[in-house]
Amino acid sequence: MSESGAQQVLARTEARRCLTDIEPRLFPGNGGPDHGEVVEVCGPERTGKTELLYHLLCRCVLPKSAGGLEVDVMFVDTDYSLDMFRLVSIIDSRLTRALSPSAGSDEEVLRSCLSRLLVVHCSSSSQLLLTLHFLENSFSSRPGLALLLIDSISAFYWLDRCEGGASFSKQEEKLSKCSELLGRLLRDYRITVFATCHAIRRIHSGLSSSSFSSSDSDRPYLCRSWQHLVTHRLLCSRQASTAGGSKEQRMRQIFTVHCSSSTGTKAHRISSFHVTDGGVDFT
């Protein structure tokens, strides 16, 4: 690469927006993810993880006039579960609430929001590795591309274990390579990553240096290369329904998110939300 080309890439990288304010209600004060940091969104099924990703995605692609950050997002769908109808419904609902009729047609603004979203699908760890290689071109050429969402990073865990046979290193080899490449992308392009991780109960003989989960049963189980990348963890759970209150209160499911960090701070935060037709609503 020529000197002028390298300077242009550097300038685009430095212009990438920091996402420490992506959702103040999730993270402790001034404790959101900085450039080059990874947030793992973990928890059992049906605890609001994907809805939380939709919320963060919408927050990024919405215009500033609607309370958004107006940055581009890359969504890597490994579960083939991305619901575009749901996502469009959430964006449209937020635009309707936030914008005045003079701000332009709903369809025009909605199209502008969706133009900031790029979606790719993967069906194996090998495809994920190739996808990350491919994405480097996008990160280098689009300074507005600030957020990478992966739903989920643990999608191929059992498949990789089966293909790896009795060798533990072989079982983790593919995800380790993905994590190492992702680490380089984080350093070189200063993006922010959010990735969901399914809860898998597994007994550990000891804690790694990067383990900062809130209980023994929620310790990380993915490879060390991935664990070393994670700087924040959002542990999602579902509150038990209460017998008291109105019928609406009893029917409305409340989800809880416990935020912890490995960046040297002791700050934690617990937030609650419920899911509406218009997306996540914090309580």
Task: Name each region found by the language model.
Residues 1-101:
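The Walker A/P-loop phosphate-binding site
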Residues 21, 57, 61, 98, ...:
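Charged, surface-exposed interaction regions in soluble eukaryotic proteins
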Residues 69-166:
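Conserved inter-motif catalytic segment of the P-loop NTP-binding fold
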Residues 38, 149, 195-196:
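Generic enzyme active-site microenvironment
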Residues 172-176, 180, 184-283:
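Phosphate-binding/switch region of NTP-binding enzymes
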Residues 50, 84, 107, 111, ...:
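Amphipathic alpha-helical transducer elements in NTP-driven molecular machines
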Residues 24, 96-108, 206-214, 246-248:
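Intrinsically disordered, low-complexity domain-flanking/linker segments in eukaryotic proteins
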Residues 31-33, 63-69, 98, 110-112, ...:
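Conserved catalytic network of the ASCE P-loop NTPase/AAA+ motor domain
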